[in-house]
Amino acid sequence: MTITRTLLHLLERHLSLSALTAGEAGPLVVFCHGFPGLAFSWRHQLTALAAAGYRAVAFDMKGYGQSDRPLDLEAYQARVVSDDLAAVLDALGAERAVFVGHDFGAKAAFCMALHHPERVAGVVSLAVPYGVQFAGARDDGAAKGPADATPQGDAKPPADAIKRTEDGVVLSARK
């Protein structure tokens, strides 16, 4: 599978994000890297998912790699970043996606689910601590962890949404 680098121009947000894409069609999976990662960190996952029939996109988060680096610190607040992710979907012509986040990229994915639940088909988080780093994810500052960053505030998915693969990987999806 081929990976293509492109620049996503989020015109209404006055922001450009460097992205790697693989796969032309299929359900969309968006990867959000952590510190000190880049879109390149997801190259193996992009090709594997594209080969499995998914459209996979990873981008350099705002302030990283070849993406824009706004000087205004408010541009990096959780709500602003979740709005950026919604604009990424718009730029890709997609209504919904599964978001995969590593480290602080998981916070972005959780906040996307909180603020734009209709655009999120699922969230996968990797290597992210539970706790105070999520404080302030909600506008009222009440979010304290991943459970608070889900639309229903319930960290426990329904039993029919969980599947364990033969190699022990646990998959979860929201309908």
Predicted regions and their residues:
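Short gly/ser/thr-rich secondary-structure transition/capping motifs
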Residues: 10-13, 37
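Conserved HGGG/HGGXW glycine-rich cap/lid loop of the alpha/beta-hydrolase fold
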Residues: 20-68, 88
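Residue-level marker of motif borders
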Residues: 13, 28-29, 98
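A short loop-to-beta-strand scaffold at the N-terminal edge of the catalytic core in hydrolase folds
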Residues: 12-21
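Flexible "cap/lid" subdomain of the alpha/beta-hydrolase fold that forms the substrate-access gate
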Residues: 1-7, 16-17, 42, 57, ...
